């Protein structure tokens, strides 16, 4: 009787079987030329979606030039291009100083949350986790609440925005506490232990936040506006503050795409393939957390982006992180820009919090994925 050759478990041939929650192996891979052409097509589609979202976001607003003139004005301000856009200096200032910072910040936040969500789902082999799993959101919310409830007088004279700074520090600190607690109970050997530690730490941070709000009811509205997510009032200073963290995080996660594919076959198999599981997991979690903490500090808590966007991308291109990370970045950035536009228009002139808009879109879509068993 002839022995059956075991199937290879290389990262390139791992796929997700929709019938069971376990990786299976594909025996046939696309030819290199076909694969490269397919990847190029999807990346160009993602770029087109993002650029289109930027144009829409910059063109819509209660004041300023007519929407159709905004793309011409943007082109007119590019090097070596001269177009008579018909946009006055005052109108251009509205576009450049008010709309564009908001659009760019929305793109950065959406891109970072989507990439971090995809990375968390890969490193923990769990399609239901998001960037807030280990406490970045709860810690950021606690930090912002602490500043808003203790009074601005305490932080008067700080060279940085106190809410953003403390939210960022608390987001990182909470994840560090989660990792320390998880490590003391065996998280180095089992990623599920780290997830459970995250649940405990998040619950504790949320309890402290609730206690502070109960004792300071006069700032509840301001705190909830922050918690529900907002991009209003975004400035180029916010963009400059966040960009370095997002760039570093995305670059690190892009460099670890192959490792994320290896994680999908299990820790033991990853070790067999030469991956240092503990070290690589720590690097990926640290990079995703750094970027998440940075964007949370300026935008508040915006849910479902890091959970749903990676699933949508998987349905389009498959589960390989070779494409999943860059496409999550492009589609996530474009999605959040459009969600912000919707929030501005739904109850104009008032604004709907962007976190509410993403929940309106994300929750039904995720229920659809669960119903059709397409959570991959």
Give the ranges of each region predicted by the language model.
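Alpha-helical transmembrane segments in inner-membrane proteins
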Residues: 2-376
């Amino acid at each position: 009787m002839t022995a059956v050759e075991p199937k290879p478990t290389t990262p390139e041939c791992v796929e997700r079987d929709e019938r069971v929650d376990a990786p299976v192996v594909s025996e046939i891979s696309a030819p290199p030329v076909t694969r490269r052409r397919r990847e190029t097509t999807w990346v160009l589609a993602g770029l087109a979606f993002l650029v289109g979202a930027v144009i829409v976001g910059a063109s819509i607003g209660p004041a300023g030039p007519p929407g159709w003139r905004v793309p011409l004005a943007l082109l007119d301000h590019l090097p070596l291009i001269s177009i008579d856009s018909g946009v006055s200096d005052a109108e251009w200032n509205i576009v450049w100083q008010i709309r564009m910072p908001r659009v760019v910040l929305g793109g950065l936040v959406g891109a970072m949350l989507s990439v971090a969500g995809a990375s968390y789902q890969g490193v923990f082999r769990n399609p239901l986790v998001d960037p807030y799993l280990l406490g970045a959101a709860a810690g950021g919310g606690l930090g912002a609440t602490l500043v808003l409830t203790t009074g601005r007088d305490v932080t008067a004279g700080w060279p940085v925005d106190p809410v953003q700074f403390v939210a960022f520090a608390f987001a990182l600190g909470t994840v560090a506490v989660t990792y320390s607690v998880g490590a003391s109970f065996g998280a180095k050997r089992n990623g599920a232990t780290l997830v459970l530690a995250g649940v405990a730490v998040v619950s504790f941070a949320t309890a402290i936040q609730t206690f502070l709000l109960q004792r300071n009811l006069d700032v509840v509205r301001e705190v909830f506006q922050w918690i529900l997510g907002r991009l209003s009032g975004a400035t180029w200073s916010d963009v400059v503050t966040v960009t370095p963290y997002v760039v570093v995080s995305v670059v690190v996660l892009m460099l670890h795409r192959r490792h994320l594919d290896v994680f999908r076959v299990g820790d033991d198999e990853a070790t067999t393939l030469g991956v240092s599981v503990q070290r690589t997991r720590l690097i990926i979690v640290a990079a995703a957390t750094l970027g998440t903490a940075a964007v949370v500090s300026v935008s508040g808590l915006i849910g479902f982006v890091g959970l749903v966007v990676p699933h949508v991308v998987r349905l389009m291109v498959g589960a390989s992180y070779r494409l999943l990370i860059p496409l999550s970045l492009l589609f996530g950035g474009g999605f959040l820009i459009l969600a912000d536009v919707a929030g501005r228009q739904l109850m104009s002139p008032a604004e709907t919090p962007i976190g509410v808009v993403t929940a309106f879109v994300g929750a039904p879509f995720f229920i659809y994925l669960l119903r059709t068993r397409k959570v991959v």
